[in-house]
């Protein structure tokens, strides 16, 4: 029943926008058809398969000269290990107030639908305002996103779209090169009525010809977990001097328990293009404090302290490119290399093949298991029970 109501809402927005808004709606999006094979490790099945049909639909409508309405929806049909993994992620989701995406079961698949964005934007002469379910992003980091604490990233899934937050922001432009922004985000607990856990703050962006600087402060209201609230201080810098350099950091301060460097998440790296742009390389290091914004259990994904991400993209021609990437953890010497081959048959339609091989000391010489290995340890440090030795995805993507 909920799925039908959501479908009716989408139809109403798309069709009714012709009458509600002054301009024609602009509908765009992407569809992905993906087949997965996973060679299991530990207690996982030795071989498993799955199929996913995914669509991201985006609606943009102008009304007058200053206002824009945005909406985005994710539609998916799953079978096999895709559905099994979705159910597992839902059961393990760190936010107990967040329900996983509901699924409706068909003849040989399960279908899901979720609202991704729903907000408006007002463009003023000096002040811009956005409000609704939207992305409020911070920092210039390309991989780890230390400053981007409202929308945490995971480079193991580079194509994943960050979830939105319910909130608003107002941006003021004293001069063309300077932006001052105030923002507010609702608590993670949607049942909170007293403002506990609400996040509000300020950011500043200054741009020069070859460099940009962002400073950020955010305060999270006291709640039942953090009785004195949480302070966050961010600084992000990028510079284009032959190489493109980036420094992106966020310090999380809990007044009840000052944890020194453990509250710091800091990414630093560079990118560079060679051979007329045919070869692109990027490397970015992450220091992940144990109670920082990128740490597991504090909104992030990582259990150790020191990581390195590297990637190289080579374009054979206008239609075909190969991407080689890896994530390496210095603490337990585990790493996860993966390769992606993309071929564009015609404009807007491409085929892709991705393979990932989790590795650690246990795989190579019988040592200890690592976070990025086939069977990673549990978050509490205990021995893991299941994982994957090899993962391969074959897919087709259509953009419109």
Region spans (language model):
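Outer-membrane beta-barrel "beta-signal"
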Residues: 343, 353-357, 373-400
């Amino acid at each position: 029943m909920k799925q039908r109501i959501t479908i009716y809402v989408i139809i109403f927005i798309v069709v009714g926008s012709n009458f509600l808004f002054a301009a024609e709606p602009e509908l765009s999006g992407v569809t992905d058809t993906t087949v997965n094979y996973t060679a299991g490790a530990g207690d996982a099945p030795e071989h498993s398969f799955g199929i996913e049909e995914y669509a991201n639909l985006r609606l943009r409508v102008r009304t007058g000269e200053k206002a824009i309405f945005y909406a985005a929806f994710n539609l998916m049909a799953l079978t096999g290990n895709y559905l099994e993994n979705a159910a597992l992620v839902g059961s393990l989701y760190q936010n107990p107030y967040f329900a996983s995406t509901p699924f409706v079961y068909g003849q040989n698949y399960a279908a899901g639908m979720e609202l991704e964005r729903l907000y408006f934007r007002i463009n003023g002469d000096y002040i811009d305002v956005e409000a609704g379910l939207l992305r409020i992003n911070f920092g210039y980091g390309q991989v780890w996103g230390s400053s981007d604490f409202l929308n945490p990233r995971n480079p193991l899934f580079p194509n994943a779209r960050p979830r939105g937050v319910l909130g608003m922001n107002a941006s003021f432009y004293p001069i063309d090169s300077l932006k001052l922004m105030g923002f507010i985000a609702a608590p993670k607990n949607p049942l909170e009525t007293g403002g506990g856990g609400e996040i509000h703050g300020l950011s500043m962006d200054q741009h020069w010809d070859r460099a940009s600087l962002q400073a950020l402060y955010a305060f999270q209201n006291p709640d039942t977990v953090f009785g004195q609230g949480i302070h966050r201080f961010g600084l992000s810098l990028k510079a284009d001097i032959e190489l493109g350099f980036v420094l992106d950091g966020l310090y999380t301060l809990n007044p009840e328990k000052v944890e020194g460097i453990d509250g710091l998440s800091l990414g630093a790296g560079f990118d560079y293009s060679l051979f007329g742009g045919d070869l692109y390389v990027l490397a970015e290091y992450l220091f992940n404090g144990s109670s920082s914004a990128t740490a597991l259990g504090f909104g992030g994904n990582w259990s150790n302290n020191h990581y390195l991400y590297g990637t190289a993209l080579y374009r054979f021609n206008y239609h075909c490119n190969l991407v080689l990437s890896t994530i390496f953890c210095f603490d337990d010497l585990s790493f996860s290399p993966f390769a992606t081959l993309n071929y564009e048959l015609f404009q807007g339609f491409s085929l892709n093949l991705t393979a990932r091989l989790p590795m650690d000391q246990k795989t190579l010489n019988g040592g200890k298991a690592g976070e990025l290995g086939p069977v990673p340890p549990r978050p509490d440090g205990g021995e893991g029970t299941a994982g994957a030795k090899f993962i391969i995805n074959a897919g087709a993507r259509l953009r419109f």
